[in-house]
Amino acid sequence: MKRNKEKHHKKNKNFENENHKAKKKYGQNFLNDSNLSDEILDIANINEETEVLEIGPGLGFLTEKLIENSKFLTAFEIDDDLIPFLNKKFENKQNFKLIHQDFMEADLKKFFEDKKNVKVVANIPYYITSPIINKLLEYRENIDEIYLMVQKEVAERIASQPHSKNMSLLTHAVQFYAEAEYLFTVPKEKFDPVPKVDSAFLGIKILKNKKYESQISEEKYFKYLKEAFSNKRKSISNNLSNLGFSKDFVKECLKKVGKTELARAEEFSVQGFIDFIEILEK
C-alpha cells in the first residue's frame, strides 16, 4: 500500500514541531520520504515470511512499512518520549512488538533464543554504527541479513575492496563474517532534521557457510589484523614487529603471497590476509 508522500511528510513534521524535538544525544534524524521506505523494503526483500528487527523506529515512518509487509517486527526504542506515540500509532498491529530499551544494553541472547533467519532493517544513530554492527554480528547464527542506513563514508569503508583507501579494520571486521554491499546513496535532505552529511543504505549478508571462520579462528585473525592496521601509514613489515616478527621475515612472507616489501594492510582481502597469516606461522 502506497502512502501519500506529501501528506505523511507533513504529518511527521507536525509531530516533531508540536510534540517531539529530535534529540541530538540519540542521534535522531527521521526519514521523511515514503518512496525511500518502499525502496528499502524492496531491496531488503521483506515479505510475509520475514521476521524483522528494527533499531530506533523514531516516528515510525519506516516502521509502518515494515509492519505492513513482514511476518513480525520487533523494534527497540530508547527515547521515553516516543514510546506513547509509537504504542498509540501501532496499537492494533498484532505483528508488532515495541521494546522500550537501549539496544546496546539489550540481552539479545534472550531475544534470539526462539528466532532464526531474522533480518535487521534500521536507520541507526551514526555515532554508534560500529558498536551496533559488532553487536549484531555476535548473533550471526540467528541473523540472515542486515540493512542499515549509515553515514555515506562509513558505508564506503565497510563495503570497500583491497587497495582502496577506505579499506580498514572495520572493513575486515564485517567482511570476515559477511558480504557487505553499498546499495545506494541517500541525500541528507531525506531526513528531518537535515544532517550535515549524506547517508547510504548498506547491505550485510551473513556468510552462513562460515567461509572464513572455517579456515582460521577469529581470535587469531584479529590478533594479526589489529597489528597490521595499527598504523596505516606504515608497512605491514613495520607493524607486525609488535608481534615479535623481524621486518626481514615479514618481507619474505609478503613476497610469497605476491605482495611487495612495502605492502600495507589495506592491500589485503580477507582471504588474502588469511593466506598471509598461514605463511607467517609456517
Predicted regions and their residues:
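C-terminal lobe and adjacent flexible extensions of AdoMet/dcAdoMet transferase-like proteins
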Residues: 227-282
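Catalytic cores of RNA-modifying enzymes
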Residues: 1-219, 223-227, 266
